[in-house]
Amino acid sequence: MIKVSDVCFSYTNNMDQLVLKNINVVFEKGKYYAILGHNGSGKSTFSKILSGIFKPQKGSIEVDGVLLNKENLTKIRKKIGIIFQNPDNQFVGATVEDDIAFSLENINEDPKKMSQIIANLAAKVQMESYLDREPQFLSGGQKQKVAIASVLALNPEIIIFDEITSMLDPRGKYDVVKILDDLRKDKTKTLISITHNMNEAILADEIIVFANGGIIAQGDPKLILNDKNIIEKAKIDSPFIYKISSALKLVSPTYDENELLEQLWKLKQKTS
């Protein structure tokens, strides 16, 4: 579990120029959280604070009851894996196989087990046919798959995904979101995704909405993303299924919008 209490952050150390203002939130073990917000809302800064890259000027973060500070940073970082928007700087191996192996070596995995673990992880992200390829020559979606496999090899309790689909083409986005959903169903890790991708966000157990450095909403995706006031205040786009629902309401004011929305929601979950 991650507990964030009254966190404030400023890039200038000026408390009158806060990027994050009094953030309070709890991330429960085994849940999938999507963090939404407009550019400059503070969500990406928040992800870097969670991973220990930035230190807040005020407030505290606890991971499984251990305070995130200088003394505990190394211990806590072993529990956290992070995947960035551009994974190129995360690759350390000459091949996909080497990159995954490097993560296993970091956790002192038994060398006799490594080949099978690498094969299993590559299959999990649909990259088993690319183990001998150089990561830098892969497509954007393939690179993100390798980054996910390498982080999974570290076996962290918490994984932070920082805008990992924002630079991908539609096929790449679909593949990566499918992997995230498989991880969500597994429920063994806490997943925190900073995203603009609504197809990704609607699969979360909870959505947290940032605006102007603060949290303005948190809860069930169906309720949050169908609230026009929240959507407008956060300056984010409505998911496609809600746009369909709203359009049909204009065509036929008598139809039951909530019933159709529920049907669309179930269809989305079945096809994801």
UniProtKB/Swiss-Prot annotation:
* Residues binding ATP, per UniProt: 37-44
- Output the Gene3D superfamilies linked to this UniProt entry: P-loop containing nucleotide triphosphate hydrolases (3.40.50.300)
Membrane protein topology class = Peripheral membrane protein
Single GO MF annotation: ATP binding
InterPro entries referenced in this protein's UniProt entry, alphabetically: AAA+_ATPase, ABC_transporter-like_ATP-bd, ABC_transporter-like_CS, ABC_transpr_CbiO/EcfA_su, ECF_ABC_transporter_ATP-bd, EcfA_1, P-loop_NTPase
Where is this protein found?
Cell membrane
GO cellular component assignments: ATP-binding cassette (ABC) transporter complex
SMART domains recorded:
AAA
Pfam families annotated for this entry?
ABC_tran
| Residue span(s) of domain ABC transporter | 2-237
Say what the protein does: ATP-binding (A) component of a common energy-coupling factor (ECF) ABC-transporter complex. Unlike classic ABC transporters this ECF transporter provides the energy necessary to transport a number of different substrates.
Q: Would you tell me the protein name for this molecule?
A: Energy-coupling factor transporter ATP-binding protein EcfA1
This chain's source organism reads Mesomycoplasma hyopneumoniae (strain J / ATCC 25934 / NCTC 10110)
Q: Which gene encodes it?
A: ecfA1
